[in-house]
Regions:
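Class I SAM-dependent methyltransferase SAM-binding "motif I" and its flanking Rossmann-like core
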Residues: 173, 177-219
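Glycine-rich N-terminal segment of FAD-binding domains in flavoprotein oxidoreductases
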Residues: 63-89
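A glycine- and small-aliphatic-rich helix-loop capping segment at beta-alpha/alpha-beta transitions
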Residues: 83-94, 117-119, 181-191
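ATP/nucleoside-binding phosphotransfer catalytic cores, i.e., glycine-rich phosphate-binding loops
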Residues: 220, 224-286
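Ligand-binding beta-strand-loop-alpha-helix segment within the catalytic cores
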Residues: 27-37, 95-166
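N-terminal glycine-/serine-/threonine-rich phosphate-binding loop
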Residues: 26-69
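Glycine-rich beta-strand-to-loop/alpha-helix junction loops that act as flexible
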Residues: 71-76, 168-172, 233
Length: 286
């Protein structure tokens, strides 16, 4: 396993401004050149990376008695969630103490549609950990008032936040949740327009409906998290990971804003890391 830490001297100042300002409604295109605080861990393959990620999640959650875990969906975190559940249950850590927050959701689908993020999280985390409804905060996919639904999640975060650990995947266009590339990124939970790329996601292959919109946490919510875990696996994400590590900060690649956060762990496999510069890595002594 390989490991690297990339540093940016301005990150703490910038991230504090983004996370604490209640007046922020948009995060503008910075196009700034900056190093990164991202700790990069390269595992041999998906299985090894998932094991590393699941262990990391369990360690972070055990650090706080009532941790808020924000969970992404999709292929990238599935293996990590299995390891995480096993770790939590085997070490007698009461899962009822965990607050689970859904990162995003497909709007316009029934809640029991197998394509929803709801269905995914119920199967991978909620039911295995027996997380009670009082500790699970979920965008309702079938809400007839999606703006009010986003406000409900925002109000909950204002009272209970910030997120302790936010688990993310890296979109093919650099999106985080449904925060898609744009001239400006919305800070708060919001209704998002779905791109053609998002609508082509494999999760939707099982649905009979076409989602009409996305519901997602905003960039401020993500960046206000105490810790962030980014999972990047497979050769199809190699260009995106290279852009994240070597490129500047721009709203046209939303994931680049993670480089401004002071505690981001990125776990990837060798296939995803194939295009990274040789000088990025040094051997992990652990």
């Amino acid at each position: 396993m390989l490991h690297a830490v990339l540093l940016c001297p301005y990150s703490k100042l910038i991230i504090a401004s983004l996370a604490s300002s209640k007046a922020i409604t948009m995060i503008k295109n910075e196009n700034a050149s900056c190093g990164s605080n991202i700790r990069l861990v390269v595992a041999k393959n998906y299985m090894n990376g998932s094991r590393e990620a699941g262990d990391y999640m369990a360690k972070k959650v055990r650090m706080k008695s009532e941790a808020i875990l924000c969970a992404a969906t999709g292929n990238s975190p599935t293996g990590a969630y299995k390891v995480f559940v096993s770790e939590i249950l085997s070490r007698n850590n009461p899962p009822e103490k965990i607050h689970l927050l859904k990162l995003d959701e497909w709007g316009g689908l029934d809640m029991d549609d197998p394509a929803t993020c709801e269905d995914y999280l119920q199967k991978t985390l909620v039911r295995p950990l027996q997380i009670p409804a009082t500790r699970y905060v979920s965008f309702q996919s079938n809400s007839r008032a999606p703006v009010a639904e986003c406000q409900r999640v925002q109000d909950w975060l204002a009272i209970h936040g910030p997120i302790d650990l936010c688990v993310l995947g890296l979109g093919l266009n650099g999106h985080l949740g449904f925060n898609e590339p744009a001239d400006a990124l919305i800070a708060a939970p919001h209704v998002a327009k779905l791109t053609d790329q998002s609508l082509a996601h494999s999760m939707l292959s099982t649905t009979r409906k076409c989602p009409t919109h996305g519901l997602t946490l905003g960039m401020r919510d993500i960046l206000a998290s105490k810790s962030i875990l980014l999972l990047v696996f497979g050769a199809s994400k190699a260009k995106q990971l290279k852009r994240l590590v070597t490129g500047g900060v721009s709203s046209l690649f939303p994931a680049s804003f993670l480089s401004l956060h002071s505690d981001v762990q990125c776990i990837c496999d060798e296939a995803a890391a194939a295009l990274l510069p040789q000088g990025v890595f040094q051997k992990n002594k652990d």
